[in-house]
């Protein structure tokens, strides 16, 4: 018996011309990560917090080796453990199995705790008090980017009511365009600001009286029942929101009963929405019924984690809810009927003055012992684009930089994917990393 390194030493001269492939192998583990979205989301936020702290240390010069080690040890243990002791298939209700699952998730939680404590320490060194109860005060925003750019800035005030607020850049005296929205612990204050590389900015915020609503506008823009469905020149956006949203870069259109009908790139003048099960912003449920016993059925599904008798269902758009609409962003919830779920919705947040869209998927899953998958398609209709995903710590091109003959049904993207054309680059960044 030899180690892999010893084997390579023996065959080194014979494999000089062997092809080199980059990225992780698409296999059961790539699929398994998606089976535990809550724990993975918790773990990946710990990874992001750790990267942020690395940047903040460049400013503070303080390095907490104990917390770094606690994060590193626990994140490694979580990432190394596989998604499934064999007994999770044959004996999912066994106490040993549930204990192993909780123990595994605890590694993610310990890693997150260490990273969060490290971030709190770094923020405290930069002057943060961590909690904001005052209706007027100062906040500091720190860019962790090495590039100059405009970023969304958000902070919340723990209060029952904040009718309006004025935010001023202390350095330039610029009054920022602000949007207030609800937050689980109070009021969220959002605005856009430009930062130099790694710049710190201080802003003063002051409570303001509620703005006076003018009733007589000489324009019919809202009905007596307070529904804003009248085409007018006074409010040129509200009556469009039940059917779509747009900014200078993108336009998204939908229709109840039909779903997403358009995802248009206004800069490139390209329709990016693909038809069928690849439609963007639209969840897909897939189910392989257990017919021959759970262990045998899972053996037969192979690398694609899909039985030959698998059925696929696409979400059916049933409702549209306008959650937020203001000078900084618009947020809309699209509610879908989807097989295998009690509740299924996609929340889209579009910034008015940034070429940026944020979206999240909310799901309440039904319980089943069948083999199931829920997908959010990230495919765009850009046939001339080169597609790359961050996989295994390196960038790889699906179908090109991978072992010949391996599956192409799904990919594990560490940080998302990039569509690159000669004129534009579109980044789809996955925060949950499924």
Segments predicted by a language model, with ranges:
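Active-site and substrate-binding clefts of carbohydrate-active enzymes
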Residues: 1-131, 140, 144, 190-196, ...
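Active-site-proximal flexible loops/turns
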Residues: 10, 150, 369
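Short secondary-structure boundary/capping segments
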Residues: 15-17, 156-158, 375-380
